[in-house]
Structures are given as C-alpha cells and as structure tokens.
Amino acid sequence: VSEVPDWLHRREHIEQRSQRKGETEQNILVEWADEAYLDESAVTFDPDYASDTGLSVRTIGWSDSAGFLITVITVRDEDDHLWGATAFRANNSDERHYLNL
C-alpha cells in the first residue's frame, strides 16, 4: 500500500468546502481524496504550479467513489511526514493535464 496524506488537521476543511466557498462547490471526502492521490494514472506537479512558496505538490487523480477527478495538494514537513493541505474537484486546467491535452 502506498503512502496517503495525513488529513488530521484538514479533514473538516475539505469535507465542508461548500460551506466556505458556496453551494456550487463540491465537498470532498477524505476517502475520495486518498483514492485520487493513489490513482495509478495520476498527474503530479512538484512543486505545485500554483504554489507561492514552492513547498506544495499538486496531484490530479480519478476517484471512482466520487466519480470525478480530484486535485489533491500535499506538503511534506521537515520530518518527511506527508500532510494533506486541501483537495477539490479538478478544474478545467487540471482536467486537461490529466487527459494530457
């Protein structure tokens, strides 16, 4: 089994996305985010092309349970622990990257 992000501090953040961003946003279950992160066809940007600091990694993968692509943002700390920072339904740009268009 491959490593998955630790969502200890961010579970509520991704699972209650629509409360912060509006009803058009999709809440993301941790299980969906992990499934997308482990997708064998996932596309990874290290560093994340949208990162201001260059410390985060963007992984775009498919979640069968959700039925759509999910973008997962992770960060490794100084102890090499993998933390989930956020996850959201992939936008059009990330979908194109995943489909290699």
Describe the role of every protein-language-model region.
Residues V1-L101:
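Ribonuclease/tRNase effector modules and their secretory precursors
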